[in-house]
């Protein structure tokens, strides 16, 4: 954290007072940097705290030169802190009646540089280096407990957010070394609640998450322009949802295991649509196919083809019959129009292939594998103060 400038923290009124007090009673101890409570600046209390602190110091550590502490800050943490200020939400309590000390190195090799309260607990803004694992923390402590901060891991992952009982808890952000980002809710060290995942290929998920898995309602956007909004089970599109692309094609209905399955409506970009039953991504069951400005077929379907009994409606004709694999094999009735004036070749047709194929969406399997490792995010217990 470095030495603080008293004119910035205490105000110019006290700058000369700190520099010119010569008596032993009032001259600040050289191991102090600044008292943070400018409204009750009292050098006697200042030195009383110094004496109490230094009488306890041998029990848990020793002073360390600020330069030596700076040498311990990992390069990834130092670079990130230079480029990004620590933004502390207004809801995070910060005790201003604290004292900023020189860095303290504990017996286990860990180092803390920052503020302490009258009870000799870490309190306020501080930085913490953990020897084991080369872990570095910058954050806010409250009476000895880390409650908000940034944790820099040796593998270049970074967490920034709220912390409770030494775990991610509340609002936070995880930046992974592969460029992926999660921002949202955490509970007891796990990704639980609502949040946003941004994957390295540009795919974005927003919605409900349970222990690192998409679970419940959410939205996903691919860089191709395809979007899905609906229910998820992991990275699987499940139950009810809507899938669209940038060209205007759209499916709205039921999904199962990344397939259209159950009842739904598929609309092509020209306005043609199929409304009815689907099975594993295909028109299968009862349904209506409305070929824009040409005809409407209502009846039985199998594997994206008319198959079974059906009725086809043209502008001047309505015909009932039987189809097999898309081919009319029997005409049972002309409800409208004269059979002599109708060319039967129009009874045989193929439907246009879907451009939206959910089980072939890019990186669904990769996304599922990626998020499996994002469930547990417990921070080390020794981030807390030495009692």
Predicted regions and their residues:
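Intrinsically disordered, low-complexity repeat tracts enriched in Gly/Pro/Ser/Thr and acidic residues
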Residues: 1-387
């Amino acid at each position: 954290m470095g030495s603080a400038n008293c004119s910035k923290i205490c105000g110019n009124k006290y700058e000369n007072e700190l520099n010119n007090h010569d008596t032993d009673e009032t001259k600040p101890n050289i191991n102090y940097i600044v008292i943070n409570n400018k409204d009750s600046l009292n050098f006697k209390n200042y030195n009383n705290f110094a004496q109490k602190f230094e009488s306890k110091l041998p029990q848990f550590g020793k002073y360390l030169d600020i330069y030596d502490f700076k040498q311990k800050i990992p390069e990834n943490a130092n670079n990130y802190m230079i480029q990004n200020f620590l933004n502390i939400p207004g809801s995070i309590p910060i005790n201003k009646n604290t004292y900023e000390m020189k860095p303290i190195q504990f017996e286990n090799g860990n180092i803390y540089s920052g503020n302490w309260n009258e009870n000799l607990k870490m309190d306020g803004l501080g930085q913490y280096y953990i020897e084991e694992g080369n872990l570095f923390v910058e954050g806010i402590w409250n009476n000895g407990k880390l409650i908000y901060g940034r944790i820099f891991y040796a593998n270049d992952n970074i967490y920034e957010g709220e912390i409770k009982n030494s775990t991610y808890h509340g609002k936070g952000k995880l930046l992974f070394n592969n460029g992926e980002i999660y921002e949202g809710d955490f509970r007891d060290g796990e990704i639980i609640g609502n949040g946003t995942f941004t994957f390295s290929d540009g795919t974005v998920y927003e919605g409900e998450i349970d222990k690192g898995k998409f679970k419940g309602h959410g939205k996903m956007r691919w860089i191709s322009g395809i979007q899905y909004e609906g229910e998820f089970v992991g990275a699987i599109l499940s139950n009810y949802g809507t899938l669209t692309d940038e060209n205007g094609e759209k499916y709205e209905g039921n999904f199962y295991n990344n397939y259209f399955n159950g009842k739904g409506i598929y609309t092509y970009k020209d306005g043609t649509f199929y409304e009815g039953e689907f099975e594993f991504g295909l028109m299968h069951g009862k349904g209506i196919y409305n070929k824009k400005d040409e005809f409407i077929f209502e009846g039985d379907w199998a594997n994206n083809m008319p198959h079974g009994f059906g009725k086809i409606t043209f502008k001047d004709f309505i015909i009932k019959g039987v189809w097999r694999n898309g081919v009319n094999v029997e005409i049972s009735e002309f409800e409208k129009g004269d059979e002599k004036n109708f060319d039967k070749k129009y009874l045989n047709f193929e439907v246009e292939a879907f451009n939206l194929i959910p089980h072939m969406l890019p990186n669904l399997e990769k996304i599922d594998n990626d998020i499996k490792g994002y469930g547990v995010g417990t921070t080390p217990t020794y981030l807390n103060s030495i009692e």
